[in-house]
Amino acid sequence: MSSSSSWRRAATVMLAAGWTHSSPAGFRLLLLQRAQNQRFLPGAHVFPGGVLDAADSSPDWVRLFAPRHTPPRFGLGPEPPRQPPFPGLSHGDADPAALPDDVALRICAIREAFEEAGVLLLRPRDAAPASQEPSQALSPPAGLAEWRSRVRSDPRCFLQLCAHLDCTPDIWALHDWGGWLTPYGRTIRRFDTTFFLCCLRDIPRVEPDVAEVVGYQWLSPSEATECFLSKEIWLAPPQFYEMRRLENFASLSALYRFCSDRPSEVPEKWLPIILLTSDGTIHLLPGDELYVKDSDFLEKNMSTDKKTEEIVKEGKVLNRVVIHSPYVYEIYMTLPSENKHVYPRNYIVNKRCTAHL
């Protein structure tokens, strides 16, 4: 059984920015390439994000948000319903003085976007309430490199940076999107990661952290899928799945409206259960007829002597990612959305690279 200490809480932000160049796609997403020496997902292209630090939930943030925004929600609106915990997944008793989880996780994602990409998702403390349109990253001020080094060394310095700039983290620009838990067996490190979506009017300047990040690209969801299939980039199954979701939106404004208008529901948080077939691997997701929400499968995989094709043909109620090889995934989905979310768009590349809806 996984103890609470073996799961590291994390947050990631999918940055979707407007694209002014001539192109049929209306927005691009920031993907960072992780260095090969990283223990988790070496070489992968990922969204900015990282592990939650105690500094992200510090009550010291309250003074920075004051007087315009007051605890506990700081103007975020009603607290979203809580998802029942997975068996064996508990984060223990929270400090009663700490910020609410969804505030702290937003600060974490914003801090990591600065550390990894040099993007400042901040807004002036005296700014008017957020307008009903995509946000804008803060222009990098002088001396930012030194601050970035300090924040990387000590996350508590992010609060000091915000105070120095007389800004607050733009937590209102981050919309709930979903969450993923690392499946058993992929790595000794397992993460409970909350995904946020942030729409930006313009593409901000990016300066990758050369220690953890060796490159970056702004790609539309369809471009990212094509680059993955052509082996130009590698995406882990959660990132691939989210890219396919985002193909539902033709423009930044459509994506922003969806995020803004989506009612507060129990946020998705999915723990893939791995089914090992005789010739491949299937990541079973909640709702799939073979998915077993049982504590036994937190620490082991399922297996069968059947081939992948047999398993797929037998299924009727599906929510799964079939892994044929590192660069050939298939998404099978027959479920209606239970929480007003979108599911991966039907997008045919070739016979072996099809999202089945």
From Swiss-Prot:
CDD domains: NUDIX_AcylCoAdiphos_Nudt19. InterPro entries: NUDIX_hydrolase-like_dom_sf (IPR015797), NUDIX_hydrolase_dom (IPR000086), NUDT19 (IPR039121). A motif (Nudix box) lies at residues 97-118. Changing L41A: 3- to 4-fold increase in Km for CoA. Reduced affinity for CoA. Mg(2+) binds at E112, E116. Keywords: Hydrolase, Magnesium, Manganese, Metal-binding, Peroxisome. The record marks R34, F40, L41, R189 as: Important for coenzyme A binding. The modification N6-succinyllysine is found at K300. Residues 78-87 have a biased composition (Pro residues). Disruption phenotype: Mice exhibit a significant 20% increase in total CoA levels in kidney. GO terms for molecular function: coenzyme A diphosphatase activity; magnesium ion binding. SUPFAM superfamilies: Nudix. Changing R189A: 4-fold increase in Km for CoA. Reduced affinity for CoA. Residues 72-93 are annotated as: Disordered. Gene3D superfamilies: Nucleoside Triphosphate Pyrophosphohydrolase. Its main location: other. One of its GO terms (biological process) is coenzyme A catabolic process. Inhibited by chenodeoxycholic acid (CDCA) and its conjugated derivatives, taurochenodeoxycholic acid and glycochenodeoxycholic acid. Inhibited by fluoride. The keyword Nucleotidyltransferase does not apply. Its EC number is 3.6.1.-, 3.6.1.77. Belongs to the Nudix hydrolase family. PANTHER family: ACYL-COENZYME A DIPHOSPHATASE NUDT19, TESTOSTERONE-REGULATED PROTEIN RP2. Fatty acyl-coenzyme A (CoA) diphosphatase that hydrolyzes fatty acyl-CoA to yield acyl-4'-phosphopantetheine and adenosine 3',5'-bisphosphate. Mediates the hydrolysis of a wide range of CoA esters, including choloyl-CoA and branched-chain fatty-acyl-CoA esters and at low substrate concentrations medium and long-chain fatty-acyl-CoA esters are the primary substrates. Highest activity seen with medium-chain acyl-CoA esters and higher rates of activity seen with the unsaturated acyl-CoA esters compared with the saturated esters. Exhibits decapping activity towards dpCoA-capped RNAs in vitro. Monomer. This is Acyl-coenzyme A diphosphatase NUDT19. It comes from Mus musculus (Mouse).
